[in-house]
Structure formats: C-alpha cells, structure tokens
Swiss-Prot record:
Coiled-coil features, chain-numbered ranges: 879-945
Annotated protein name in UniProt: Valine--tRNA ligase
Family to which the UniProt record says this protein belongs: Belongs to the class-I aminoacyl-tRNA synthetase family. ValS type 1 subfamily.
Species of the source: Neisseria gonorrhoeae (strain ATCC 700825 / FA 1090)
One example GO MF annotation: aminoacyl-tRNA deacylase activity
Sequence motif 'HIGH' region, location on chain: 42-52
Name of the coding gene: valS
Cell location: Cytoplasm
Keywords, sorted A to Z: Aminoacyl-tRNA synthetase, ATP-binding, Coiled coil, Cytoplasm, Ligase, Nucleotide-binding, Protein biosynthesis
SUPFAM superfamilies with a match to the protein in the record: Anticodon-binding domain of a subclass of class I aminoacyl-tRNA synthetases, Nucleotidylyl transferase, tRNA-binding arm, ValRS/IleRS/LeuRS editing domain
C-alpha cells in the first residue's frame, strides 16, 4: 500500500536525487545520436511566470523523451544579465538610501550590481527546479560571466575587423528617464487621446498665402527641415520647391513631394522633422534634407540646434528661440502652442487618437533621438575573416535568410516563416550600444583626437595607437548581443570542442513569437557567420499564456497566476495581497479583489508540479494564445490522484502474488480478451504518443495519455480485472496480474516526460515487480516501443461487444430510474453465445445475475433494450405512476432551463456582441439540454405504451 498522494514530499525527494546523481548531464558518447536544446535565458532579475512554466514544460518534456530514447542529451540553462532591467532594480535600491549611481561612480556601482546578482540572481533557476526542469546545471551560464565576456569581445572585434560594426549618427528610441537608447522590444505603443494641431506655414515669397500643416507634436517644430506633400495632390503641386516660413523661428524650409504623405490624412501637408521622427528620417534621407536636433538627452530644448547631414557629419548650427531653451519637451509644447495662437499661426486643435511609444521600464514617452551609436551592418558584405562554408561571403541578413529558405532552419508552425521573411526583407542596421553601466562594455578606446581603436584589451588598443593614455568607450552592448551568441558561446567556441561537434546545431528552439526578430533571427545570423552552422534545426513557436478570459497576464492588471502558487497553494489573503500590490491603476484594487474572490474563493489549493505540467502540455497546440483555465489544472490534479489510486489497486492485487514474472515467468498465462485488448491499446498509445512527442504536439500526447490511462486502463480494464481476479482460474489470474503490472509500468514511462515526479515515485515500486527495473531512475529507462504483433483485432472486436452490452444495461437502468443500490437479474436473448461477455456484467452493472436464455420471459412491465441483435431484459418491477411523476418533474425542470437559454440566445444583438466563447458555451449547453429532454420524453412515451 502507498501512502496518500503528497506532491510536495515526492517532488523535493526526487529532484534532489536526480541532480545529485548527475542524471541531467550528457554522457558525451559521440557515437550516440545527440539531442540538445538551449533555454531562452530568463532575466536574472526575474521570477517564474506562466510563460516560463509553459515553455519549460515543453523543453523538459522533449529533453526527458530523448534522454529515454537513448540520446546523448544536453539541455543548457543560463540567465541573462538584462542590462536595463537589472540596472533599474539596483538604482531603485540605492535611491531608497538617497544615493545615485553617479554618487558611487561606475566601478562601485557595478560592485553593487554584482552583489545584488549574487543574492537575488538564483531565484528563477531554483523555481525551474521546482517545475522539474532536468537541465544540465553543471553547464549553467550567465551572459556576463568570464567565458561569455571573452566570447562577446572576440565576436565584436572580428565583426569590426570585417567591416560589419561601425559607429555613426542614427535615429534611435531614446528613453530620457533612463538616459539610454532602447530596443523596439522595450517600447510599448499605448493608445491615448491626444490632439492634432493645425498650424499655418506662410509662403516666404507671399506671406499672405500659407499651407496648413497638421501635427501631433508641435514641440518638434523647431527641428523641421521641410514640409512634404503628395506629388499627386493637385492642391499643392504648384508649391513644390517653394520656401515656407517656419513659425516662431523665422527660418525658411522647402516644400518637397513624397509619396509617404497620404492625401486624405489631416490637411495633406506633413512637417518633416528627420531628427525626431523615424518616418521623417526616411523621407529626409530620400531628399537629403538636414538633420536638426533640438533636444538634449533629457528631452529638454537646446539653446543651439545641432545640425548634421545623412553621413553623420556636423553642419553649421544655429540658435533656437531663447525662451524655449532648457524647457522640458512637454512644457515647451504648452508654451509654443500658446505662442502660435498669439502670433496667429494656430488654425485649430482637433481631438485625435494616437499611439504613444512608451518605455516598458519607466513609462516615459520615447523620443526618437539622433545620437552617436554603434551599429552592426545587416546588409553589408564582410571583407574577409570568415570560416569556409556555404554562408561565406553573404551579409548577415542574407545568411539568416538562406538558413530558413534552404530548410536548414524550419519554423513550427510553418506560417511563422512569412513573418520572419517580412521582417528580414525590411531589416535595418542593428543599434547595439546602450548608455548604461551594467553590461558588456564596448571594447573600443579613443585617443585625444577622437580616433577609435577596437581591440581585445587595452594593451592591444595601445599597440594599435602607438601610444598610451587611451580612454575606454563608456557605452555597453545591447543585452541581445550577448544573447545572440548563446548557441556557440555555451559550447566552447572559438575552440573546436566535442560539445560544438555534438550539440551544434541544437535540435529545436522553443520560444514565443514576440522575440523572433530580436533573438531568433540574430542567433541565426551570428551562428552561421562564426561557425558556418545553423544554431538550431527547428524553431517551435508557442502561444502566449493569457488569463481565463483571454487577457494578457500582467502584474499591473492584477490577473497574474504565479506557477509556484499553483504548485504549493496559497491562501486567499496572501493571494489578494499579491494581486492588488503594484497595480497600474490602484483604484482598480476593489475590482481585482472581487474578481479574485470569485475565481479563487478559498485561495489556490496545492496542485503539485505534475498537475501544472500536464495542464501546460495540454495547452501546447499550435495556436497563438493559451487561455489558462484553473479548472483544467484541478482536473489534472485529479488525474494524478487517479494514477496514484490505480497503482495502489494494482499493488494490493499483485504484491506477494504470482504475477508471471521472475520464478513463474515460464508458467502458462491464460490471457483473456480484455488483457489482449488493453495490451493492444497500450501499443496503439505508444505509437500515438511517440508521434506526438516527435512533432512537438504535447497537447495530443497529453490528450492520448489521459484517455488511455483514465478511460481504457482505469475505468475499463481495472474493473474487468476485478472480475478476472475473483472468478478466473490460476492461469487467468496470473495473466491478469501480469497485464496489470506490465501496462501500468509502460504507462508510467510514457507519462514521464510530462509528469516526472509521480511517475518516478510509482515506477520505483512497480518496475521491480515486473522485471522492468533496467535503470536506477525512470528517466534513464528506455521509452516504450510499439509491438504491432500485440495489436489483436479480434480482441478489439470482442471488447467492443462487451462495452456495448455494458452500455446498454447501464442505459436501461438509467432510463427506468433503477437506483444504484438496487440489483436485478438480466436476461439476454441472442443467437450468439455470449457467455464470455455475460460473466463481466453482474459486477460492472450491479446485477444479481446475467443469464442467456432462448427467449425472454413474459413480463409486461420489465424494461427491454436491443444491443447488436441481442435483446436485454431487466427483471424488475417498475412503479409506473411514480416513475411517470419523476420523469414529468424532470421534463418540467429541463423545459424551464431551455426557455431561459433560448430567450438569452434570441435576445437582439446578443450573439453578435457577447464574447464568442460565451456564445459557443451557451449553444453547447442548449444542445445538451435538448438531448436530455429528448431522452426523458422517450422514456415517458415507453411508460404510456
């Protein structure tokens, strides 16, 4: 007998043992097929969220499956230094002590960051262990550790020497609060209600005539370089090439023609400010306008405009109106709008809905800013220094395109190839510099004249310069730069290691679609460029985990479910505290609290890691999003309990019994058709589950396993086994025990990749009883293989007959309202001999006996059913009046429910306006009620006959 199922107890016990025994490490036998997978490195600042739990369940499931298939298996874990995120956390801690990073200086500040990383950095990897991740922790890396730092420097220097890294003036996303450039991924577009200002720009040669320019950003007017109109817009063709007076400045700017301008948007005249708008930058580049920067790095108006050409060369500047100098951009907007109105330039202000770019860390409005940055050239051809391979001589972008076009890297689902190619065909040079302190400091040094020397260290730079006293570049690299090198920086490159031979390319990358461009594409570029190999053979793109209503999970919205809370459980009070702290809108706290109480009235009970993993596996379809339903997790907790209880039943009936193993393995075993059926179903399940794992369809694997274990094994075979163990001969009983153990042990191995803890615990007891303990751990045991010879169709046919008979008797009992505790005799009239089937019916359908007769006895009231040509009669007296009353009451209740639901669905506009999933549920409920009503009406009709 097993103790009560306690997930917490078995999880801690087994994980500790797996890790200490070294089971997660590859054996590095290069004669064996390899399976490797890279963990998308989570931020070192992070804690586990549902997205992590989702993709880590898939990754761990694959790793465990291929390990059991005998592969040399490596799942390589690591964490990302997360430049901006980490620096913000530490700066906030210092701010609480009234200290800034500038007070400390760079060196002391970085010491503080490393201290914080050592204390807090391991949280997420410990939580990964809680989920059961069988990663090789001996290979764990940090993207700023010594090995990775050397690789980053080597890659940077080589790219620079190949002409693929350069420094130049470019427009970037600038966060004025952080004081750094940020990537597109770190910018959120927020819909806001704003204004559209219509401003007069007078003609220089005729100030009484003017064009009306519509803009949402009047504060950038000081940096205007032109006004653009559509060349096909007849209203303005006569003005193309003319000069306009720029309001508030007295400067003149030209009217230019560009198809970028939409004739029907606003007034059809657009101010072009190339130094403060990405679209304007492209227009300005086409027309070779000036780049006029009017803001400093804090987004305050400069006293003197900085002017450049599109080669990044400084041009003569000019002074800006003195009254705006030093004003924050939004204060400047307010003042300038007032001045425009006062001077007669403001025509009107219209309300306008716009998308405002905001920094995801600070919430500040992102400013397109012209700054000196380091870039990786995406479309330039390297000038040598590449390894000799099929990708040699191609630009980084073309390498990444070829890898996918050739099929060397495939996307799952395939439709993501279109998204990938669309981005690759519109790729821009990659801005890799960040104005931060935490990160890989760019390996470049400057002399007093501003000459740059890129080198692996200062001594090498000084050798290049032929002098000392050089100054190191202060900027650090974009976090994605070091992340892009992970496929080979974790395997010993630039040395030719066994790890590189065995594990590059890895088999699959499991990730979300939001970082296809920022990480996936760049890994393909860097890996093909430096190794001549692709980083991975497949990219499995999974959906985003959302809440049960399909909303994005966000701490600021109060709808986050912490995976660890699902594993361990959490009381309502603590859950409410977690969900109402840090809300974006604190005033929504009562609403969040109400929703939480409704969803989790008693908090979240402990589910255990296995139930969480099975839930995640069941959601791993090829869709774009996953609506997480807590009820499903509860259902899979029950499934784990079902497996535990089924094992208990098997042990109770096999321990210290003759099971046909060991000493009695050669003794005859009289397999019944239920034995042959469940063995056949096991083999079918092995085939289906293997196919599902191989094609990354964990949802199908979970569905198949659930159906086999719960329905076939527990609900059918265990119940039939009870009959065989009570009534069968010694040979039949031996065969039944043999089958009980054999099928259970194989099922545990099939389940192990998804639910590793409970399967390990049970396998350690079950496997020795059926001579299947071939390894110290289930994770090292072989994955089951199909034996087609054991799929016996006659047994399947016999089982169908038995299931039909049992179903018919159960329906007969239900239709006539026979109480579960009432036993009755069953008489069966059939031309076929049904003796092999009838012996199972008394226990399975609560009968006193099941007897085959030449003809059914005379009985006017006894219920009769027909099943596959056989006539079945339950010999039981029925109180017609009482049964009619019961069914009539049931029909009345069903009719009320039907009327209510029909009224809801026929309400004008309901099916069009209500959420689709609610409408579908209502329609499904209606169909179910109609089916029940039809059955009740049928039973009433029979009683009247």
């Amino acid at each position: 007998m097993l103790d009560k199922y306690s997930p917490a107890e078995i999880e801690s016990k087994h994980y500790q043992n797996w890790e200490s025994q070294g089971y997660f490490r590859p054996d590095m036998d290069l004669t064996k097929p390899s399976f490797s997978i890279q963990l998308p490195p989570p931020n070192v600042t992070g804690t586990l969220h549902m997205g992590h739990a989702f993709n880590q369940t898939i990754m761990d499931g694959l790793t465990r499956y291929y390990r059991m298939k005998g592969c040399n298996t490596a799942w390589i874990p690591g964490t990302d230094h997360a430049g901006i995120a980490t620096q913000i956390v530490v700066e906030r801690q210092l701010a609480a002590q009234n200290v800034s990073r500038h007070d400390l200086g760079r060196e002391k500040f970085l010491e503080k960051v490393w201290e914080w990383k050592e204390v807090s950095g391991g949280t997420i990897t410990q939580q990964m262990r809680r989920v059961g991740c069988s990663a090789d922790w001996t290979r764990e890396y940090f993207t700023m550790d010594g090995v990775r730092a050397e690789t980053v420097t080597e890659v940077f220097v080589r790219l620079y020497e190949q002409g693929l890294i350069y420094r130049g003036k470019r427009l970037v996303n600038w966060d004025p609060v952080l004081g750094t450039a940020v990537s597109d991924l770190e910018v959120e577009s927020m819909e806001e209600q704003g204004s559209m200002w219509h401003i007069r720009y007078p003609l220089a040669d005729n100030p009484t005539e003017a064009v009306i320019v519509a803009t949402t950003r009047p504060e950038t007017l000081l940096g205007d370089a032109a006004v653009a109109v559509n060349p096909e817009d007849e209203r303005y063709t006569h003005l193309i090439g003319k000069e306009l007076i720029l309001p508030l400045t007295g400067r003149t700017i030209p009217v230019i023609a560009d198809e970028y301008v939409e004739k029907d948007f606003g007034t059809g005249c657009v101010k072009i400010t190339p130094a403060h708008d990405f679209n304007d930058y492209e227009v300005g580049k086409r027309h070779d306008t000036r780049l006029i920067n009017v803001f400093d790095l804090e987004a305050k108006v400069l006293a003197n405009a900085e002017v450049f050409n599109f080669k990044g060369e400084a041009q003569p500047g000019f002074s800006l109106p003195e009254k705006y100098a030093g004003l924050d951009r939004f204060a400047a907007r307010k003042q300038m709008v007032a001045d425009l109105q006062e001077q007669g330039f403001l025509v009107e202000i219209k309300p306008h809905t716009l998308m405002t770019p905001k920094g995801d860390r600070t919430g500040s409005v992102i400013e397109p800013m012209l700054t000196s940055q380091w870039f990786v050239a995406m479309s330039a051809t390297p000038n040598g220094g590449e390894p000799d391979n099929e990708f040699k001589g191609l630009s980084l972008a073309d390498k990444a395109k070829k890898a996918v076009d050739s099929g060397a890297v495939r996307f799952i689902p395939e439709n993501w190839v279109n998204t990938y190619n669309q981005w690759m065909n519109n790729i821009q040079d990659w801005c890799i510099s960040r104005q931060l302190w935490w990160g890989h400091q760019i390996p470049a040094w400057y002399d007093e004249a501003g000459n740059v020397y890129v080198a692996r260290n200062q001594a090498e730079a000084e050798k290049q310069a032929g002098k000392t006293g050089l100054t190191r570049e202060e900027d650090v690299l974009d976090t994605w730069f070091s992340s892009a090198l992970v496929p080979f920086s974790t395997l010993g490159w630039p040395s030719e290691t066994d790890e590189l031979k065995a594990f590059l390319p890895s088999n699959v990358l499991v990730t979300g679609y939001e970082i296809i461009f920022f990480w996936v594409a760049r890994m393909i570029m860097m890996t093909t460029h430096f190794t001549g190999k692709v980083p991975f053979k497949a990219v499995y793109i999974h959906g985003i985990v959302r809440d049960h209503e399909g909303k994005k999970m966000s701490k600021s919205e109060g709808n986050v479910i912490d995976p660890v809370d699902l594993i361990d459980g959490i009381g309502l009070d603590k859950l409410l505290m977690k969900r109402t702290t840090g809300l974006r809108k604190p005033e929504t706290a009562p609403k969040v609290e109400e929703a939480t109480k409704k969803l989790f009235p008693e908090g979240i009970p402990s589910m255990g890691a296995d139930a969480l993993r099975f839930t995640m596996a069941s959601y791993a379809s090829l869709g774009r999003s996953v609506n997480f339903d807590f009820k499903r997790a509860e259902g899979y907790r029950n499934f784990c309990n079902k497996i535990w209880n089924a094992t208990n039943f098997v042990l109770m009936n096999t321990e210290n019994q003759d099971c046909g193993y060991g000493a009695t393995a050669a003794e005859p075993r009289g397999h019944s058709f239920p034995d042959m059926w469940i063995i056949g179903r096991l083999n079918q399940t092995i085939e289906q589950v293997t196919q599902a794992y191989e094609t990354y369809r964990f949802d199908l694997a979970a569905e198949t396993l659930y159906s086999f274990v719960w329905n076939d094994y527990c609900d059918w075979y265990l119940e039939l086994a009870k009959v065989q163990l009570q009534t069968g001969c010694a040979s039949r009983q031996r065969a039944t025990r043999h089958t009980l153990l054999r099928v259970l042990e194989a099922a545990l191995r099939l389940l192990h990749p998804i639910i590793p803890f409970i399967t390990e615990e049970l396998w350690q007891t079950v496997a020795p009883m059926c001579d299947a303990k071939t390894a110290d751990s289930i994770m090292l045991a072989r994955f089951p293989e199909t034996d087609g010879g054991e799929i016996v169709q006659t047994a399947f046919g016999q089982m169908t007959v038995l299931q039909d008979l049992i179903g018919a008797v159960r329906n007969l009992r239900g239709e006539t309202g026979i109480q579960p505790n009432v036993k009755a005799p069953l008489f069966v009239e059939s031309a076929d001999d049904l003796a092999d089937y009838l012996k199972y019916l008394p226990m399975m359908t609560r009968l006193t006996e099941a007897r085959q007769v030449a003809a059914l006895p005379e009985s006017g009231d006894a219920p009769v059913a027909v099943c596959n040509g056989a006539r079945l009669m339950l010999k039981v007296e029925i109180d017609k009046a009482a049964e009619t009353a019961r069914l009539s009451k049931e029909a009345e209740k069903l009719q009320k429910a039907l009327d209510k639901l029909n009224a809801k669905l026929s309400k004008p506009g309901y099916t069009e306006k209500a959420p689709a999933h609610l409408v579908e549920k209502d329609k499904a409920d209606l169909a179910e009620l109609e089916d029940k009503m039809a059955k009740v009406q049928n039973q009433l009709a029979k009683l009247k006959d």
